[in-house]
Every structure is written in C-alpha cells, then in structure tokens.
Amino acid sequence: MKMKSIGFMALLAAAAVGCSEKTEVKSACGCGTAAGGHEEKTVSRPVAGEGEIAAARLDLPERHFLRKTMGRDYWTYFYSWKFSDPMVKLEGIWDSPEVANLPMFKDCGIVYWSGKLHLPKGKGVWRTVEENFYPSVLEKLENAGTLGRPLTLMFHPKCRYLPALVGEVDLDYDNYKAFKKKHPNITAVRVQSEWGVELVQIMLGRNDKRHSPELRAKFNEIYDRYSWTNRYDRLQQAYWYMNRHKEIHYNDNELFESFRSANFLDHMAAAAGATTLVSETTGTGDRVQEYRWDVSSMFIRGAARQFDVDWRWYVAGYFNGFKQNGEWMYNSHCGYPVEVDKSKPSKRRPECGVSDSVERRVCYFAYLNGAGGIEMEAWGGNFFVYDEKTGKVGLSPRGRNFSDFHDFTAAHPDRGAPYAPVAVLVPIAQGYNTCGGKAWGFCPYTPADHMIDGIFFTLCPGWDKRTLYSKGREGLLHNSKFAMMHDVLVPDTPQKREDFLKALDCYPAAILAGDHPASEELVSRMKHYVSEGGTLVLNSAYLERGFGGDFTGVDATGSRFECSGSFTDDFGKTHEVKGEYDCLELKPASSAAKVLLRDGKGRILATRFRYGKGIVVTVSPLWMAPRFTSGDAAVVKTRLGQIRFPFAEYVLGRLQRDLFPFKVEGDCQYGANRRKDGWWLWVMNNNGITKYADRHQIVDPAAASDISVDLGKVKASKVRELIGGSEIAVAGGKFDFTVKPGEVAIFEIAE
C-alpha cells in the first residue's frame, strides 16, 4: 500500500490535542540502551535548596542512556571501498594485509552508494530497489548481509540528485518490503543530505540553464510560494523538500536517516519520522561565518533525546581559509599521494584541509558527546600513503590518528551517558545556523534571535575570525569556561504532549529562548514541567504571553526602563553591563518571590519563585540581549565576539554552579559522562594549533593549558587518565593536569 507524506501543519494539528496527565520521571544509575528494555524505576526529584535556582540529579534518566544498534552504542562507519568492505578484492599496492586487518576496517558499519546517476525518462525514481544499483554494488550488498554489521544505503538517484525532485513516482512497495526483510542489518537509508544548505543552493540556482525546464519550473513554483523572509514559510519550504525525498524513498519512517550540515534541522526531521539523525561538520565558511561544531552537538543530541532516536557524526575535512601568503583558498582538502610513478607530480596535497589535530579532536568530541557512529568523508584519499619499503599502501598520519581513536572506543566501550542537565528551548521555525545569526540565514534579525545567539555565543564564545584566520588560528571547537552540559529541545514540534513532557522532565533546568508564539499549550507544558520539579528560566517578554503572576511570582507594571553599567546579585557581587538593555518593570505578585538581581538604582532585574516542586526564574531585560539598531551589524559583532551577554552569562553560570558536579578551572573545553560506577570528565585544549589552508599544522608547545579540577561532592576512590594511561594523584578532592595544545584528556573517576 502506498503511504502518503504528511505535511507539517497536519502533524501539528494532530499534536495540538494535548492532555494534562502527570509524567513520571524515570532514572537509574548507569547506562544502557533506550531500546533495550530496561526496567525503569520512578524516583523522587530533588528540590532546590536555599541559594540554589536548580536541583541537581546525578543519577541520569533512562531516556538519556545511549541507544544501541545491533547490540552496540557506537560504530565506526566507512563507505564501501577497498579495506572497509571485505567483499572487495584487494590488488596491487592495495593488497596490504597489515592495513586490511586493522580493527577499524574489520569491525565497521558500511555505507553503500548505488552508483547510478541517471533516471528512466519522465520518472523521478527507479521502481524497484535493485534497479538503483549497478550489479557489482548489488552483489557486494547481498554478501554484506552476513557480516553482522550495520549497513546504510544511499540510493541513486542519490538524495542530492536534483532530477529526482520532479517526475513521476512509481514505486514497488512490495519489492522494498521484501528487500528490507532480506537485509535485516540495513539500519538506515540516507533520505536527504545537507538538507538546509542543499535547499538554499537549489533556490538560488533555480533558473540555472543546466536544469531541465521541468526542474526550473518546480523550483520557481516553490520559490514563489514561500517567502524567504518569513521563518514559517521557510519551514514549509524545508518540509516540501524533505517530503519529496521521503516520497522517492518509499516514505519509510523505519529507516529514515536525515543528514544535515550548516542548518540545525534535526528536530524538524525527527518530528517528521526520522529514526537516525546525522550532523555533518566541516571547515568551510567565509571570513566571518564559522562552522561551530560544539553548538551542533547540542542541537542534534537534544533532538535525539527528545524523540528517542539515533544520531551520528560525519566529518568532512574541507577548509576555507587563508593561505600563508594571505590569499583566500576555498575547499582546501588533505590528500596523501599513493602514486607509484614519482615522475608525475601528485595532485594530492597532504598539507591542505583542516588540521590533523582538529580532525582527531572532533572524533573524541563526538564520541564523548554520545554519537552512535562517526563517518569520515573522503577517507580513501587522506588515510593512506604509498610506502616505498613495502611497495604497498600504508596508513598516513591521519589514518593512524583515526585507527588509534577507533581502538580507544573498542578498549573503552562504556563511555557512559553525556551529562546535560539543562535544556535550551528554541522554536521549530528557527532554522538555526551553525554560525548563528538570522533565522534560516535570511529572515529579519530580531531581539529574540539575539537572545538565542546570546546563549550559544556565551557557551561557545565568538572570536574574531577575520583577524585570527589570517594568523592561522583554526577555531571550529572552542575553549570555554562553561561545561558542555546543554541540549536543545523544541516545544512546538508536532510531538504528542505527553512525549514532549517525558523528554523535558529529564532535565533539571530549562531556558525558554527565542520567539515562541503565544500559546495556551506552551504555558500549560511549562507549568507542568515546573510543578513536577523543573527550573524554568523565563524572559519577561513572556509575561505578556500568558505566563502570569501565579506562575512567576511577579507581574509586569507595563513600564520600561534602561539598564546599563552594572547589576548586583543576591550574594552582593557586582557584575558589569556593557551596552543598553530595555527592561520590563517587575513588581512582586507574591511575598514568596525572591529578588536575585537588581540594577544600580535598586530596580528588579531577576527573581526566583517556587511553583509546585520547581522554580521559575524571571529575567527582566528583554530577551537578555542588548539593544541594537542594525540586525546585520549585531550578527557580525556577535560572531566576532565583540558583544557580551552578561545576563545570559549570569544565568548560565548560576545553573552550572548548581548542576555540574565538578569545578574545572583553566583554558579548556570540557564535559562529563555519567557511568555505572562513576564518571568520565573529559577536557580538550583547542588552542595552540596554527593551520593555514595550504600548510601543515604547527603546534605551539607554549599553548599548553594547566587545569585544576575540584571533584566537589563526588567521592573519588581513584582517578585515571585514559588516553595516556596515567594514574592521577588526588589531594583534598582536587587534582591538577596539563593538557597539551590540540590534545584531549579523559579522566576516569571511580566512586
């Protein structure tokens, strides 16, 4: 039976019928798989004490345990080529048993590309699964079914093949059903690739004469139907694109893999049925816009947890940046020479691409943040180099790095579950970009958008890319005083009320960020969350959108005032304010409302109020972001790190003090994973690597970072650094360590 694509508005209407039943919060100590049938135990949630705004839960909820694919919560993935596919015959210089028998190749998931780049005349698809594949690929795929490894399929016309967006769709659903049954280890079908970026490229090139008249007509129809400056129109445009891709992939929600790059559309895909989410990270961008890999993890992991689906990480080592001579270079990419004939210069350039260091670091970063798989792009070109001694191909430095990383994951399979106690709640129509800024990259920039940027550019600081790139500074991952302890959830997806609340109730604290339309359902969901023990950070703008004094403990008088200079917290500490903030005047609606912040004139800037078992923190400065006159200028200054957000910084710092179990001091990036018998605390030093687009990386030994860790209430019986294997001396619940530039340290803390 042919299935129909369901549009966003239909899904949203179906989800609007909510109910107000209580949602139990389940937790346990340790880690497993959400699909593994764990017996969940209901536990009472702790209550925030005096001087706290949130109560920590160190025993993670069952929902945050890592999901498993074919019995494991992590797989390395390679596309089918040479060593990664045992069905491929190795010959000549590639007949290298030492490489072929490496664990990363003997024990990996395989991605199969069908290979065909044409379609039957007038059709948008091939009718049967088998018709998509060349016989040689199909033969390998048939044999791979016995390997006991997960397989991912990419049909051709592949997900980015434009002619597939028009033409008749005539599919044999019985054939597809039989194919799936015959290949039970196919765990994903890549339905779309670089979703948001691809859509922009299509629309901007809609009149390209290389497209057929039918294709140009379809692109212009979609372009004219939806406004590029209306975020909800852009949402509909994105769903048109996704629904077409689902249609030509049999509308299969069981194996629906959604792959995106620069726009973080993970929640949209999961709401529409995706069961695997993939984040692509790369080093492309312009002189101001930067791929911010750390922020990407907050979105995709949050979506996976909200919808209880799998997620993976895809690493593309392309780099847009300055050459050492000051010229700009696009799509610089590393490649090692494998040519035997040295009389001909190799076209491959091992000095190009992102640095060896950041490519290695991001693998550990993704693994530690919970990715169920990591896939390297173009590894066939940068993992191998010709070895004149053996006359065979051997591993390049990047190949050795990845092999060592894979071996680490095999030696330490119990990484625990990433500890992320704070949910940042953003609207579904945000279309948030890896470099922040305007919704979808084109919609007018609003103060509410500035609030979202304020949060993420405080957690992962902006930096002057224009200046630092010219000096060879790389970026992509960022040191920060804030822990990687935040997930992004989306309240207004077409998800059942009870399912969303199950997801949200797993987080001790949440921040309502951005412009959520006024909605009784949103108010109801937030009240439920707080009444059951959660802490909600609420901006005063929402006092005019249905959140009243009974919930917040304060009312807006209707008057406004300007805050600048400084503010003082309830501990008597003064904090600097740069810029001007428009604030709503607040008056207590209850004697139980406690003032947290006041400006220099004694006016209320933030309050704490207990509602049910939880707490509402109301922040007066509108959108917690400074006033601006030009949205474009505000975006650029934010990206370059020229704007600070002191109210976001204060709230995030206060939540971290209450919720993160460790205190880490020193210039680094860090996070924690909860395990059965303790913790992993991981630390990265992203400084000290100079990388031009046309030169090998240079490591500055002077950029080592001395860190100090206070274990707080965690009683450690032993601490060991896992990558180097050293025992760490702990004195008075504290220890020190030096992280070399561009390196990673993982501390196993046994309780």
Predicted regions and their residues:
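Aromatic-Pro/Gly-enriched surface loop or interdomain linker
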Residues: 51, 55-62, 66-70, 86, ...
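Helical hinge/lid and interdomain linker segments adjacent to catalytic or ligand-binding clefts
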Residues: 99, 106, 120-124, 128-131, ...
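Substrate-binding cleft of secreted/luminal carbohydrate-active enzymes
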Residues: 311-322, 340-388
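Glycoside hydrolase catalytic-domain groove-lining segments
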Residues: 259-346, 362
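Aromatic-lined carbohydrate-recognition surfaces of secreted/lumenal glycan-active proteins
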Residues: 77-78, 154-157, 190-192, 227-263, ...
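Carbohydrate-binding surface patches
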Residues: 417-452, 505-507, 527, 605-626, ...
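Mature N-terminal, pre-catalytic/accessory segment of carbohydrate-active enzymes
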Residues: 19-141, 146, 150-152, 176-178, ...
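A glycine-rich, often tryptophan-bearing local segment used as a flexible ligand/cofactor-contacting loop or short
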Residues: 516-604, 652
